Amino acid sequence: MATFDDVKAVVAEQLSIDADAVKMESKIIEDLGADSLDVVELIMALEEKFEVEIPDSDAEKLIKIEDVVNYIDNLKK
């Protein structure tokens, strides 16, 4: 769950929300209140944190926090 903890910290910081509000099942836009600009900035912050590249075509599919965690875990394999 280390990836989740790191993702949670980045999401909380980028969206200026309490980290406790970020759950695996949280939808980034609907549940956490992100807008399209927030999502772009969030993806950039995740790329920097995890030293990965997330193409726009993949970023569109990252709806829930769980999607982000699984995506990053797969990249790190």
UniProtKB/Swiss-Prot annotation:
GO molecular function list: acyl binding; acyl carrier activity; phosphopantetheine binding
Biological process, per Gene Ontology: lipid A biosynthetic process
Signal peptide: none
Localization annotation: Cytoplasm
Keyword hit for Membrane: no
SUPFAM superfamilies with a match to the protein in the record: ACP-like
Record domain Carrier: where: 1-76
Keyword tags: Cytoplasm, Fatty acid biosynthesis, Fatty acid metabolism, Lipid biosynthesis, Lipid metabolism, Phosphopantetheine, Phosphoprotein
PTM field: 4'-phosphopantetheine is transferred from CoA to a specific serine of apo-ACP by AcpS. This modification is essential for activity because fatty acids are bound in thioester linkage to the sulfhydryl of the prosthetic group.
Entry-annotated residues carrying O-(pantetheine 4'-phosphoryl)serine: 36
GO cellular component: cytosol; membrane
Listed Gene3D superfamilies: ACP-like (1.10.1200.10)
Pathway in which the depicted protein is active: Lipid metabolism; fatty acid biosynthesis
Entry annotated with the keyword Amino-acid biosynthesis: no
Family: Belongs to the acyl carrier protein (ACP) family.
Role noted for this protein: Carrier of the growing fatty acid chain in fatty acid biosynthesis.
Protein name per its UniProtKB record: Acyl carrier protein
Native organism: Campylobacter jejuni subsp. doylei (strain ATCC BAA-1458 / RM4099 / 269.97)
Gene: acpP
